[in-house]
Protein backbone atom coordinates (compact mmCIF):
# COMPACT_ATOMS: atom_id res chain seq x y z
CA UNK A 1 0.00 0.00 0.00
CA UNK A 2 1.23 3.47 -0.86
CA UNK A 3 0.60 5.96 1.94
CA UNK A 4 2.45 8.91 0.43
CA UNK A 5 3.79 9.32 -3.09
CA UNK A 6 7.41 10.36 -2.71
CA UNK A 7 9.32 12.14 -5.49
CA UNK A 8 11.68 9.15 -5.77
CA UNK A 9 8.96 6.47 -5.97
CA UNK A 10 10.19 3.40 -7.86
CA UNK A 11 8.00 2.81 -10.90
CA UNK A 12 8.13 0.56 -13.96
CA UNK A 13 6.71 1.79 -17.25
CA UNK A 14 6.05 -0.57 -20.19
CA UNK A 15 5.69 0.19 -23.90
CA UNK A 16 6.06 -1.87 -27.05
CA UNK A 17 8.05 -1.49 -30.25
CA UNK A 18 6.83 -1.01 -33.77
CA UNK A 19 5.51 -3.80 -35.95
CA UNK A 20 3.88 -4.18 -39.34
CA UNK A 21 0.09 -4.26 -39.53
CA UNK A 22 0.34 -5.62 -43.06
CA UNK A 23 2.74 -8.42 -42.23
CA UNK A 24 1.80 -11.86 -43.46
CA UNK A 25 4.13 -13.40 -40.90
CA UNK A 26 2.34 -15.50 -38.33
CA UNK A 27 3.60 -15.06 -34.80
CA UNK A 28 5.53 -11.89 -35.65
CA UNK A 29 7.27 -10.50 -32.57
CA UNK A 30 7.96 -7.03 -31.26
CA UNK A 31 9.87 -5.85 -28.23
CA UNK A 32 8.29 -4.98 -24.90
CA UNK A 33 10.45 -2.56 -22.91
CA UNK A 34 10.10 -1.76 -19.23
CA UNK A 35 11.92 1.26 -17.82
CA UNK A 36 12.50 1.34 -14.05
CA UNK A 37 12.83 4.83 -12.62
CA UNK A 38 13.03 6.73 -9.38
CA UNK A 39 10.28 9.28 -9.93
CA UNK A 40 10.85 11.20 -13.14
CA UNK A 41 14.58 11.84 -12.86
CA UNK A 42 16.70 8.72 -12.51
CA UNK A 43 16.66 5.62 -14.70
CA UNK A 44 17.49 2.63 -12.53
CA UNK A 45 17.18 -0.14 -15.10
CA UNK A 46 15.61 -1.49 -18.27
CA UNK A 47 13.73 -4.77 -18.76
CA UNK A 48 12.85 -6.42 -22.08
CA UNK A 49 10.77 -9.28 -23.41
CA UNK A 50 9.52 -10.30 -26.85
CA UNK A 51 5.76 -10.40 -27.38
CA UNK A 52 3.64 -11.69 -30.23
CA UNK A 53 1.85 -9.27 -32.52
CA UNK A 54 -1.90 -9.82 -31.99
CA UNK A 55 -0.98 -12.61 -29.55
CA UNK A 56 -2.09 -13.43 -26.02
CA UNK A 57 1.27 -13.27 -24.23
CA UNK A 58 1.71 -9.65 -23.08
CA UNK A 59 0.34 -10.23 -19.57
CA UNK A 60 2.64 -13.22 -19.03
CA UNK A 61 5.61 -11.24 -20.39
CA UNK A 62 4.95 -8.36 -17.99
CA UNK A 63 4.44 -10.67 -14.99
CA UNK A 64 7.60 -12.62 -15.80
CA UNK A 65 9.56 -9.42 -16.35
CA UNK A 66 8.53 -7.98 -12.97
CA UNK A 67 8.76 -11.15 -10.90
CA UNK A 68 12.13 -12.30 -12.27
CA UNK A 69 13.80 -8.89 -12.11
CA UNK A 70 16.28 -7.73 -9.49
CA UNK A 71 14.08 -4.69 -8.81
CA UNK A 72 12.28 -5.78 -5.66
CA UNK A 73 11.41 -2.28 -4.47
CA UNK A 74 8.99 -1.41 -7.28
CA UNK A 75 5.85 0.34 -6.09
CA UNK A 76 3.74 0.83 -9.25
CA UNK A 77 3.47 -0.47 -12.81
CA UNK A 78 2.62 2.15 -15.45
CA UNK A 79 1.13 1.12 -18.79
CA UNK A 80 0.51 3.15 -21.92
CA UNK A 81 -2.86 1.67 -22.79
CA UNK A 82 -4.09 -1.89 -22.39
CA UNK A 83 -3.34 -3.24 -25.87
CA UNK A 84 0.19 -3.96 -27.00
CA UNK A 85 1.53 -5.30 -30.30
CA UNK A 86 -1.83 -4.77 -31.96
CA UNK A 87 -4.56 -6.55 -30.01
CA UNK A 88 -2.41 -8.31 -27.40
CA UNK A 89 -4.64 -7.27 -24.47
CA UNK A 90 -3.29 -6.90 -20.92
CA UNK A 91 -5.28 -8.58 -18.14
CA UNK A 92 -4.94 -5.77 -15.59
CA UNK A 93 -6.35 -7.73 -12.64
CA UNK A 94 -4.03 -10.66 -13.26
CA UNK A 95 -1.02 -8.35 -13.68
CA UNK A 96 -1.85 -6.69 -10.36
CA UNK A 97 -2.58 -9.95 -8.52
CA UNK A 98 0.45 -11.89 -9.76
CA UNK A 99 2.99 -9.09 -9.22
CA UNK A 100 1.45 -7.64 -6.06
CA UNK A 101 1.83 -4.17 -7.57
CA UNK A 102 -0.81 -1.58 -8.39
CA UNK A 103 -1.25 -0.87 -12.10
CA UNK A 104 -1.94 2.57 -13.57
CA UNK A 105 -2.88 2.83 -17.25
CA UNK A 106 -2.31 6.19 -18.95
CA UNK A 107 -3.84 7.18 -22.31
CA UNK A 108 -3.95 10.43 -24.27
CA UNK A 109 -7.29 9.70 -25.96
CA UNK A 110 -10.38 7.84 -24.86
CA UNK A 111 -10.37 4.52 -26.71
CA UNK A 112 -13.35 3.66 -28.90
CA UNK A 113 -14.22 0.36 -27.22
CA UNK A 114 -17.07 -0.43 -29.64
CA UNK A 115 -14.74 -0.01 -32.64
CA UNK A 116 -12.17 -2.20 -30.90
CA UNK A 117 -14.81 -4.87 -30.26
CA UNK A 118 -15.91 -4.76 -33.91
CA UNK A 119 -12.30 -5.15 -35.10
CA UNK A 120 -11.72 -8.04 -32.71
CA UNK A 121 -14.86 -9.85 -33.87
CA UNK A 122 -13.85 -9.35 -37.49
CA UNK A 123 -10.28 -10.65 -37.17
CA UNK A 124 -9.99 -13.02 -34.19
CA UNK A 125 -11.50 -16.40 -33.39
CA UNK A 126 -10.99 -15.71 -29.69
CA UNK A 127 -12.53 -12.23 -29.94
CA UNK A 128 -14.94 -12.74 -27.03
CA UNK A 129 -12.09 -13.61 -24.63
CA UNK A 130 -10.21 -10.44 -25.64
CA UNK A 131 -13.39 -8.37 -25.42
CA UNK A 132 -13.98 -9.72 -21.90
CA UNK A 133 -10.56 -8.33 -20.89
CA UNK A 134 -11.44 -4.93 -22.38
CA UNK A 135 -14.79 -4.85 -20.62
CA UNK A 136 -13.46 -5.72 -17.17
CA UNK A 137 -11.07 -2.76 -17.07
CA UNK A 138 -11.89 0.01 -14.60
CA UNK A 139 -13.50 3.21 -15.87
CA UNK A 140 -11.31 5.97 -17.30
CA UNK A 141 -10.68 9.01 -15.12
CA UNK A 142 -9.99 12.33 -16.83
CA UNK A 143 -6.84 13.91 -15.37
CA UNK A 144 -6.22 16.68 -17.91
CA UNK A 145 -9.39 17.63 -19.83
CA UNK A 146 -9.33 16.12 -23.34
CA UNK A 147 -5.59 15.38 -23.01
CA UNK A 148 -4.92 12.68 -20.43
CA UNK A 149 -6.92 9.86 -18.90
CA UNK A 150 -6.03 7.02 -16.57
CA UNK A 151 -7.45 3.89 -15.01
CA UNK A 152 -6.11 2.06 -12.02
CA UNK A 153 -6.16 -1.37 -10.41
CA UNK A 154 -4.98 -1.78 -6.82
CA UNK A 155 -4.63 1.94 -6.13
CA UNK A 156 -7.15 4.66 -5.37
CA UNK A 157 -7.69 7.35 -8.02
CA UNK A 158 -6.20 10.19 -5.95
CA UNK A 159 -2.96 8.30 -5.33
CA UNK A 160 -2.78 7.14 -8.96
CA UNK A 161 -3.12 10.76 -10.13
CA UNK A 162 -0.31 11.74 -7.76
CA UNK A 163 1.93 8.95 -9.15
CA UNK A 164 1.31 10.26 -12.67
CA UNK A 165 2.16 13.82 -11.63
CA UNK A 166 5.33 12.83 -9.74
CA UNK A 167 6.63 10.70 -12.63
CA UNK A 168 5.90 13.23 -15.39
CA UNK A 169 8.75 15.57 -16.22
CA UNK A 170 7.49 17.37 -19.33
CA UNK A 171 4.24 17.15 -21.26
CA UNK A 172 1.57 14.71 -20.14
CA UNK A 173 3.15 11.24 -20.30
CA UNK A 174 5.08 9.84 -17.31
CA UNK A 175 8.81 9.65 -17.97
CA UNK A 176 9.12 5.84 -17.64
CA UNK A 177 6.51 5.42 -20.41
CA UNK A 178 8.12 8.08 -22.60
CA UNK A 179 11.54 6.44 -22.30
CA UNK A 180 10.15 2.91 -22.81
CA UNK A 181 8.54 4.14 -26.04
CA UNK A 182 11.82 5.64 -27.27
CA UNK A 183 13.90 2.58 -26.40
CA UNK A 184 11.40 0.12 -27.91
CA UNK A 185 11.18 2.05 -31.18
CA UNK A 186 14.99 2.29 -31.37
CA UNK A 187 15.34 -1.47 -30.89
CA UNK A 188 12.85 -2.18 -33.67
CA UNK A 189 13.79 0.53 -36.21
CA UNK A 190 17.32 1.58 -35.33
CA UNK A 191 16.24 5.03 -34.17
CA UNK A 192 13.99 6.31 -31.42
CA UNK A 193 10.69 7.94 -32.25
CA UNK A 194 9.28 10.95 -30.47
CA UNK A 195 6.62 10.32 -27.86
Curated annotation (Swiss-Prot):
Top-level lineage group: Archaea
Gene3D superfamilies the UniProt entry points to: archaeoglobus fulgidus dsm 4304 superfamily
NCBIfam families in UniProt: PRK00766.1
Family: Belongs to the UPF0215 family.
UniProt xrefs under HAMAP family: UPF0215
Name assigned to this protein: UPF0215 protein TK2033
Organism field: Thermococcus kodakarensis (strain ATCC BAA-918 / JCM 12380 / KOD1)
